[in-house]
Each structure stands twice: as structure tokens, then as C-alpha cells.
Amino acid sequence: MVSSSNLGFPRMGENRELKKLVENYWQGKVEETQFQKELKEIRINHWKLQKEAGIEIIPSNDFSLYDQVLDHIHLFGAIPKRYTPVVESEIEDGSNGLRTYFAMGRGYQTSKAATQVSETNTQGAFASKVEKSIDVGSMEMKKWFDTNYHYIVPEFEDSQQFKLTNYGGYSEPKPIHEFLEAKSIDIETRPVVLGPISFLLLGKSSDSSKPYSSKFDSLVHLNALLGVYEELFKQFEKIGVKSVQIDEPVLCFDLFETELIKNAYTTAFNVIHKAAPNINILIATYFGEIRENIDLITSLPVNGIHIDTIRSSSSEVESVLTKIPTSWTISIGIIDGRNVWKNDLTKSLVTLKNIIAKTGSDRILLAPSCSLLHCPHSLTREIGRVESQVLDWLAFSLEKLKEISFLTYALNKCTFTTENTITFPEDTCSKIKEYYQLNKESNQKRRESKLIHNDIVKKRVTEITPSMLKRENPFPVRREAQRKRLTTLPALFPTTTIGSFPQTKEVRLARSNFKSKKITPEAYDQFIRDEIRKCIKVQEECELDVLVHGEFERTDMVEYFGEYLAGFVFTQNGWVQSYGSRCVKPPIIYGDVNRPVPMTLEYTTFAQTLTTKPMKGMLTGPVTILQWSFVRDDQPRSETCFQIGLAIRDEVTDLENKGIACIQIDEPAIREGLPLRLSDWNQYLKWAIDSFLLSSTGVKDSTQIHSHMCYSDFNDIFESIQRMDTDVLTIENSKSDLKLLKAFEKYGYTNEIGPGLYDIHSPRIPSVEDMKDRVEQMLKYLSTNLLWINPDCGLKTREPETTRLALINMVKVAKQFREIYANKE
């Protein structure tokens, strides 16, 4: 018999209950006992929902207050030494470990430390009862493989020690606690643990002066780490755990150091098997193809494997299946865990019947392709709010679990003819038959819908020429023209921000009232204009050089543009976690994309009338819009990206024609779109960079094109970054210990650049001294003539006053360096 299973469930809740609860905890608005009570309610509700959807194998330990990798960092006692003052403060006041946990994720600054930095009393993270001056930044964040989710990067010392810890008020390690919690309501779960090899390979050296020279260097810590896995799995066996899912997504990478990797995996899984010989181990891979790594996997003492069939070709799946031992469980990721389209159940049944013909049914588990962390919670609240024809094509997490449940039922109970038609047993509930029939009709309607296709858009894509993918002149010529035009710009160390400014409760309320028609469009427009005025006043008081309008009209840098572009649809509650408590609501691209009307022209040109300084036009680039949306799956992603590129190009032209001299086209997502396999990179990078160039190159030399990139390791794609040919590139760098700058030095980057001077994801206020030190480090790698001074990302999630104080300090730094280098000249 085939069984139904799940790899992971969205954490936030149907109405983002977790986000609100955690943020209230940070602000001291909820007591510890109530906090733990409500967390438990969320977890139990999620387990019950999965059971009610018909899932037999339900995960535990997939829940997290911030990030699953951060959970493992704390669980394994791998807390960097700079957080020792936070740890000690918890010991002194009897806290539960969560202050340290959240400090690693978002930084920690006591009121006393904030006062010393800013001369104002500002509270950072939830306070210690023992008031000390503690000021520590957050750990680095990176994108989780090629998704828009961010994980906290583990840090390892030369002689890193690990120990299994309890935190968060638990009397046992988190995976143990959550298994027992589910068991208390009669739900037997399969705990999810990040595998030891993936955990180490996702990490970095804690010493920025001695970075790892190879991505495999962190494996030196394997033997020390395995002690905690051994202890954890012994505890699993002791409490009656029958099966554990060990996530090893790096097994979809090119693992060139074959013997090193083989020895590491063999050692690790031998230790785990010996510690818990009676537990069935399922190795979960996802986001790519296993390919040659199947030989390594099948040599390990485990009991099963999960295959992502959505990201694997049919020939790859067939090849892998032939090598799996006959005694193993095979988890088939048949439902797309990363997109929102309704599964074609007939097509999936054909695929699964072919697999079962080779493997038999008794060892088959059906599952999503990956954790449903990357998919919204449920379609329940979208009924009547999303265009009905498009809504009929969609499936969110709960709907996907029901698809898995149906496929499991059909494979176990139904018969199939040679024409792939399905015959239900006589006692089948009419609702099951109706469910299948409606699925067939939905998929047929989507294939035939006239909503999807626009012949004019398709024709424009075919007419793209090489001349549309390059600027008229090289950067030195353009730079001279831009400096002549931008007369207020200082010769050295110009300052700017990345775009968005803090969105207060008042801004969010006004937007909500506008969308619910509680205020008129005219009243909302006036409110936005007033916010823009205040934003420009703050920037001028801070003495910034290139200003922004603040983006108060925008909820999200992708959602806003999608609302103006044809081919997009938006949900009311389709939230997914991005990092920590931050959620995003990705638009859904269902058809051909074009720009019926200008998107940013009105507020950008209005803002420019309020200042004599340059006002940046703020746009999101085509690759980022693509990456941060749920994308149609009926044509190549490259085709959709070129369509978006043409739409952005039209907007850039309009801004230039209205006198906007600086236009920023953000592309923070270019690197995250890279396929997991190196052999697939060139094809992706070709169309991704071409799409950006298509959007950015149709301007005069005197128009300065900016772009922003964040959470990116540029070393291995530097030639592609150079090919973007932006006049000013701003990058997230504050969390990366300046390691990105070494790539710019190595490859001789000659355009202007603004590495992030401080981390906006942390509530702490950066000091002048901290930022001066960072600039001094930057100048070891970059020319004074090319360096811009700016934060590392947009300021939307920060508080207005801490933002103002941080920018004042940042401008002080720029002025000091202008004075230093003016004197040198």
C-alpha cells in the first residue's frame, strides 16, 4: 500500500499568528507563559490540519521561531563567542535561552548600549533584567539554496565544540520536545533534522581573516559534531521514535571531492545508525537532481530516500530508481512544494503508476517535492478575493496535502485502463469522484484560457536585438556625463539609501483603509504625498546626497509592480516566510506580462519637485520579480523574464523622459536563481543578465543606473555581475565580514560601488566608530573615487527614529572621510 507523507508545513499560521506572537514577545507585550502556550497551540493546530487532510506521516521539528538552521545552531551549542555577554545575561536573570537565540538572528542591543551609540534611549531586542551595555550584531543570512527563504549561516571556530542543549523553556532538546508534544495528542510524527554534512557545508569560518578556502573545509568539525547527533538519536530511540527524516539537500550539488565527501557521509551515518539501529532513516533531497550522488546515498546505512521529481527530469528519476535497494522506502516528491499551481492528478497518476510498476507499491511514500515552508497556508481566505478563473487553477499547502491524499487513495483503491482512465471502487464517496473530475476540468480550462496569451507581448520578445542589451558608451564616458549632470553630488563618498523608508503603523493603516475603501483614493494619495514630504525632509536634515521618495505606497518591492503589470494576480493572504518574522506575499504570474500604464512616474516626479538634490527612481528588476513570484509553469522561465524586462524598460524610459537622473533597478535575487548544478549555470546566467540589460540599457549616458544586490556571494558569478554594467552597484555586505569585497579587488571592478555600511535587519543603531572601521576596511579593496556610503538594504522594517539616528551617524562617517582625503590631495 502507498502511504501519504509530508516533509514540512508552513510555520506562520493561516493568519500569520506566529509572526504576530513573536514580534509581541520581542516587544515585551506577551509574558513567557502565555508565549509558550500560544506557540503550542499553533504547533498542535498544524499537526491536526495535516492529519485531517489525510496525511499519514506527519513531520515534527519543522516548526521554528526564526529559522530551522538557527534552531540547529542553538541545539548543537554552536553559539559564536561574541554572544557570550548575552548568554551570561540570561544566566544572571534566569532566562530561557531565547534572548541568545534571537540575538543571533537579529542582533541585540540593550538600552544602555543604544544610549551610548546614539545619545538617545532606544530599546533593542527584549530586555535583560540585568541591565548592562550589550551591543552585538546578528549572524549572516543567506538564501536557502535557490529559494527566497533566508537561513542563518553557522559559524565554526578552529576547535569548535558542540553540545546538545535545551532552550526556549523546554526540559529536553527541541526535536524531542516537539515529538512528545505531538504524541500527547495521539499523533505519531516523523522528526525532521538537518543532516550533519549539510549543516557543516552551509557554515563558514568564524574568523573573517581566515575564511575557508574550499566549501568542504568545514568538514574538519565532523567528528566533534557527530557526538551531538549520536546523543540526539539515542534520545529519539529511547522515547519511541520510529522514523526520522534527515535533510541532506547538498546531495543535489556537484560534490567534486568524492572521497572526502564519501568518507564524511559514511562516517556520519554509521554513527547515527549505531546510535539508533531501530529507527528508520529517510534521507531527504530536494531542489534538484541527485544524479551521480545516488551511488553515495545507496552505500549508506539508511532505510529510504526522498526524490524531488518536480526538479528532476523523468529520465533522471528513472535512473535513480534503478539503483535504490529493494528494501528501501522511496518518497516521491510528486506535488510541487514551491509553486501554487493545482496538480494535474491524471498526469501524476500516470507517472506514479509507471514508478510503481518498477518498484512495487508497498515501499512508496507520496510527498511534496520539498517542505511546504515555501508555499502559502491555504486558499480558504482567497475565495471571492482572487479572480475566480485563476483561483480555480491554484493549490496552497493544505490543498496540496489533499492532492497527496487523493493520489494515495487512487493508487491504493482504483484501477486504470490502458487509456489512463481511472475506475473508482463502487463504495467510493461521491465527493472523491467529484474532486477528481473538478481537477481534470480545472487543468483543461487553464490550458485553453484566453487570459494567458497576448500576441503583442510575444512578438516584442521575438524582436529583441543585441543592440537592446548594451549601453551606448562604456562606463568612463558615462561617468563623466553623469558628473556634469549631477552637480550637487560630492566628488568623494556620496551618500544614499537603498530605497524604502520605515513604514509606520499609520502608513499600514492608511493602506489598509484605502484597500477596504474606508478612505477615498484622493485622501490616500494626499497621505502618501505628505509621507514623501516628511521623508525628504528627514533625508535633507541628515544631509544625504541622492534621495529617495520612501516607497510608502508600496507593500512589497515585487507586489507593487505586479499590481500594475498585466499577467499578474494577487492573493489577500498568500503569505510565505522570508526570514525571521518577515513574511512576503508573492504575486502569481499566470499569463503574458506587459505594462498597460506607468507604475512609478507620479510619485517619483512629485518627489523630485520637493528637492534640488537628485531623486532616485526606484524599480525592481525582471529577475527579482520573477524569482520572488509564483511563476507560470507552462512556458520557460526565461520567456517570462524577458517579458518583464521589456515592461521595466518602458518604465525606465518614461522616468528618464521626465527628468529623473538616477534610476535604481534592484536585482537582489539574481544569484539565488542559480541552479544547484554548476553545469546548468551558464544557461541561466545568460538569460538572467540579458533580461536585466534589456530593462536598463535604453537610456542616455547622463542617466545614472543604480542596482542593488543582497545576500549574494559574487565570487563565482563575478563576470556576470560585471556584464550588468551598472553605473552604481550597492550590495549587502554588513553581514558578510567584507568578504565580498575581495572578489571586487580580485576581478578589478571599475564601476562605482556602495557596499552596505550597516545591517538594517538588526534593530541596533550602528556607531560612527563601527562604520568608520568598515569604510577603512573597504578602502583596502576599493578606490576612493568609486566608493558610495549607504546602508546595506532598504529601511522599511526599521523604526523611524533609529533610522534617522543611524543615517546621521552614516553621513558623519562620509564627511569625515571626505575631509581626510581632501587633505591628502
Swiss-Prot record:
Pfam families, per the entry: Meth_synt_1, Meth_synt_2
Binding-site residues, Zn(2+): H708, C710, E732, C793
Classification via Gene3D superfamilies: 3.20.20.210
Enzyme class: transferase
UniProt cofactor(s): Zn(2+)
SUPFAM superfamilies named in the record: UROD/MetE-like
GO terms, biological process: methionine biosynthetic process; methylation
Positions of transmembrane segments: none
Binding-site residues, L-methionine: I498, G499, S500, E551, D666
Residues at the catalytic site: H761 (proton donor)
Keywords in alphabetical order: Amino-acid biosynthesis, Metal-binding, Methionine biosynthesis, Methyltransferase, Transferase, Zinc
Pathway: Amino-acid biosynthesis; L-methionine biosynthesis via de novo pathway; L-methionine from L-homocysteine (MetE route): step 1/1
Any one Gene Ontology molecular-function term assigned to this protein's record: zinc ion binding
Described purpose of this protein according to its UniProt entry: Catalyzes the transfer of a methyl group from 5-methyltetrahydrofolate to homocysteine resulting in methionine formation.
HAMAP family, alphabetized: Meth_synth (MF_00172)
Classification via NCBIfam families: met_syn_B12ind, PRK05222.1
Record family assignment: Belongs to the vitamin-B12 independent methionine synthase family.
Name of protein: 5-methyltetrahydropteroyltriglutamate--homocysteine methyltransferase
Origin species: Dictyostelium discoideum (Social amoeba)
